[in-house]
């Protein structure tokens, strides 16, 4: 037996508020348009009024059109345009209260400048006479039910405790959600044990962060950039959600702005850097260097690729003493590189090791670098190298502001 058509398909739609004898007036809210090139069976009314206040009642619209030419609803009201604009700005629709430590104040201000949806909140960072922290979160009741984030900088063991005290306290203030932004994960290079008795401090810090109290919406989200080893994501427990971001997209934008952007070649100082970043830089020619041991020394050699006549940019996740980058620079220059630059997401530079890098002012790539790009993930380093060639700082503010909306 054939199925009986639905009763709404057999009868015209009816609305008690509109009779069949009444003339429907054109509406300023919506208009119906059809393609004049396709003939219609019958078209009596060009426009009709949509009664949203009585949307559950059926309207009597005697309007026959071709099945091949469906009605197009064209928005022309100011109210609809406003809603469209809101959809276009959905990237920053979530309002976030951003706290920060003293080291990250400048970065926090740059993040807040990205969007009006990010509001800076203050914390009083004081100490007792014995040196232990005396902390106070201003207007604690004002963040109830709101999305809260904290911008941290674990630049030294001494500041970790006071920041952890705040990090553990914020989720307990009845906030809707809590996000920890730690641009540089400081113990990332201590992720493995080679001898019995070695302590993997990366695992220790991951366990500490994994025990941050949950907020009303669930576990804490952790945003960090270019962590040293991707397998460190498995160090974190189930009570934290790591979000691993990268500064490489910012580097690619910077390289596109160079006058010799079509002559760029990417070099990796070792296999680890190649495995970490080569997929994000596939459209560039690549060079891979390798560390080899000769006697008691470890030297850098060219493993594959040709730097002759190219502007070679060395890419790695972090730099400390800078010895590997300098050796790589010398090898590339010896093999004919026209220019040598470098990029690292995290410029740590303990003991002012940044002073080892000189600018190339005479066209001698073996003596200096054309550019040395770092991000502002390590605020103390940014203060030291500011306005000192060849260093240039690429800010993570835009990337962090976008991550706060996740």
UniProtKB/Swiss-Prot annotation:
A Gene Ontology biological process in which this protein takes part is:
purine nucleotide biosynthetic process
Q: Which residues bind Mg(2+)?
A: 226, 228
Query: What are the transmembrane regions?
Result: none
Q: Which GO terms describe its cellular component?
A: cytoplasm; mitochondrion; ribose phosphate diphosphokinase complex
Q: Is Mitochondrion one of the keywords?
A: yes
Q: Its catalytic activity? A: D-ribose 5-phosphate + ATP = 5-phospho-alpha-D-ribose 1-diphosphate + AMP + H(+)
The lineage's top-level taxon is Eukaryota
Annotated segments matching region Disordered: 1-32
Q: Where in the cell is it found?
A: Mitochondrion
| Compositionally biased tracts (Low complexity) | 18-32
- The transit peptide region is found at 1-87
InterPro entries on file:
Pribosyltran_N, PRibTrfase_dom, PRTase-like, Rib-P_diPkinase
Its EC number(s): 2.7.6.1
- Pfam families assigned: Pribosyltran (PF00156), Pribosyltran_N (PF13793)
Q: Does the keyword Nucleotide-binding apply?
A: yes
Q: What class of enzyme is it?
A: transferase
Q: Where is this region: Binding of phosphoribosylpyrophosphate?
A: 309-324
Gene Ontology MF terms: ATP binding; kinase activity; magnesium ion binding; ribose phosphate diphosphokinase activity
Task: Keywords in alphabetical order, please.
Answer: ATP-binding, Kinase, Magnesium, Metal-binding, Mitochondrion, Nucleotide biosynthesis, Nucleotide-binding, Transferase, Transit peptide
The UniProt similarity line reads: Belongs to the ribose-phosphate pyrophosphokinase family.
This protein's name:
Ribose-phosphate pyrophosphokinase 3, mitochondrial
Natural source organism? Spinacia oleracea (Spinach)
Taxonomic classification: Eukaryota, Viridiplantae, Streptophyta, Embryophyta, Tracheophyta
């Amino acid at each position: 037996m054939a199925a009986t058509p639905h009763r709404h398909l057999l009868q015209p739609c009816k609305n008690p508020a509109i009779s069949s004898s009444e003339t429907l007036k054109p509406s300023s809210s919506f208009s119906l348009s059809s393609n004049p090139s396709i003939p219609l069976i019958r078209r009596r009314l060009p426009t009709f009024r949509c009664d949203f206040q009585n949307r559950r009642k059926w309207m009597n619209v005697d309007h026959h059109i071709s099945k091949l030419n469906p009605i197009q609803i064209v928005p022309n009201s100011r109210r609809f345009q406003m809603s469209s604009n809101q959809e276009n700005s959905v990237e920053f629709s979530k309002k976030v209260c951003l706290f920060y430590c003293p080291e990250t104040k400048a970065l926090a201000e740059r993040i807040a400048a990205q969007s009006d949806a990010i509001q800076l909140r203050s914390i009083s960072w004081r100490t007792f006479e014995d040196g232990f922290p005396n902390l106070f979160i201003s207007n604690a009741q004002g963040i109830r039910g709101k999305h809260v984030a904290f911008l941290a900088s674990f630049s030294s063991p001494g500041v970790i405790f006071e920041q952890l005290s705040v990090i553990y306290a914020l989720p307990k203030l009845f906030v809707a959600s809590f996000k920890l932004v730690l641009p540089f994960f400081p113990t990332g290079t201590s992720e493995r044990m080679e001898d019995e008795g070695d302590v993997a401090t990366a695992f220790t810090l991951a366990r500490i962060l994994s025990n941050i109290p949950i907020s009303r919406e669930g576990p804490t989200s952790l945003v960090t950039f270019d962590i040293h080893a991707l397998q460190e994501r498995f160090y974190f427990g189930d009570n934290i959600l790591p979000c691993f971001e990268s500064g490489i997209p910012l580097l690619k934008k910077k390289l596109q702005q160079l006058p010799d952007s079509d002559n760029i070649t990417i070099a990796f100082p070792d296999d680890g850097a190649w495995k970490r970043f080569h997929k994000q830089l596939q459209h560039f020619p690549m060079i891979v260097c390798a560390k080899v041991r000769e006697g008691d020394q470890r030297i850098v050699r060219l493993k594959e690729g040709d730097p002759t006549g190219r502007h070679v940019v060395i890419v790695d996740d972090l730099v400390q003493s800078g010895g590997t980058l300098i050796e790589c620079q010398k090898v590339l220059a010896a093999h004919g590189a026209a220019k040598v630059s470098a990029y690292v997401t995290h410029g740590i530079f303990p003991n002012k090791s940044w002073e080892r890098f000189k600018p190339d002012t005479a066209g001698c790539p073996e003596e200096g670098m054309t550019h040395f790009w770092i991000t502002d993930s390590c605020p103390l380093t940014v203060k030291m190298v500011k306005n000192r060639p060849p260093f240039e700082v690429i800010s993570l503010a835009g990337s962090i502001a976008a991550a706060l909306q996740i």
